[in-house]
Amino acid sequence: MKIVIQRVKSASVSIDGKIKEKINQGFLLLVGVEDADSNFDLDYAVRKIAQMRIFSDEADKMNLSVQDIQGEILSISQFTLYAETKKGNRPSFSAAGKPDFAKAMYEKFNDSLAQIVPVKAGVFGADMQVELINDGPVTIILDTKEARKNA
């Protein structure tokens, strides 16, 4: 899994011009799945995201997690994180997970994360418009492939 984690003051996702979901302070996640992903990747990502301390404490040090601040998460499926751009000018997305597998993993990821932190989500495969107010900005890229190699 590749996940872009953005610390936000607020975020929303709209479909057909109507807001589907919105959150206040927390994380906007852009979530990509590849066919090699497994429950290991899912569990690793959930644990890392729930415990990642990138919110400032009273000393202005990044020391608080999304749980600590009672924040929320807006999760958006994003197969384009697996774009391959080596050849030509049009990206290839063949490295992205097959739609049925990716959808199941994405939904399981959201369900697992929602047991720890409030999670709202976009619609898998839909054409969505995402608005956010970055906080910092703080943007982290989590790639579970590295953890899988070392497991």
Swiss-Prot record:
Compartments, record wording: Cytoplasm
Keywords from the named record: Cytoplasm, Hydrolase, RNA-binding, tRNA-binding
This protein's record includes keyword Cell cycle: no
GO molecular function, one term: tRNA binding
Primary localization: cytoplasm
GO CC term, one of those recorded: cytoplasm
Domain of life: Bacteria
Locus of motif Gly-cisPro motif, important for rejection of L-amino acids: 136-137
GO biological process: D-amino acid catabolic process
Primary enzyme class: hydrolase
Reactions listed under catalytic activity: glycyl-tRNA(Ala) + H2O = tRNA(Ala) + glycine + H(+); a D-aminoacyl-tRNA + H2O = a tRNA + a D-alpha-amino acid + H(+)
E.C. designation(s): 3.1.1.96
Pfam families: Tyr_Deacylase (PF02580)
Entries under InterPro entries matching the protein: Daa-tRNA_deacyls_DTD, DTD-like_sf
Function of the molecule: An aminoacyl-tRNA editing enzyme that deacylates mischarged D-aminoacyl-tRNAs. Also deacylates mischarged glycyl-tRNA(Ala), protecting cells against glycine mischarging by AlaRS. Acts via tRNA-based rather than protein-based catalysis; rejects L-amino acids rather than detecting D-amino acids in the active site. By recycling D-aminoacyl-tRNA to D-amino acids and free tRNA molecules, this enzyme counteracts the toxicity associated with the formation of D-aminoacyl-tRNA entities in vivo and helps enforce protein L-homochirality.
Domain notes for this protein: A Gly-cisPro motif from one monomer fits into the active site of the other monomer to allow specific chiral rejection of L-amino acids.
Subunit-level organization: Homodimer.
Protein name: D-aminoacyl-tRNA deacylase
Species, as recorded: Lactococcus lactis subsp. cremoris (strain MG1363)
Gene: dtd
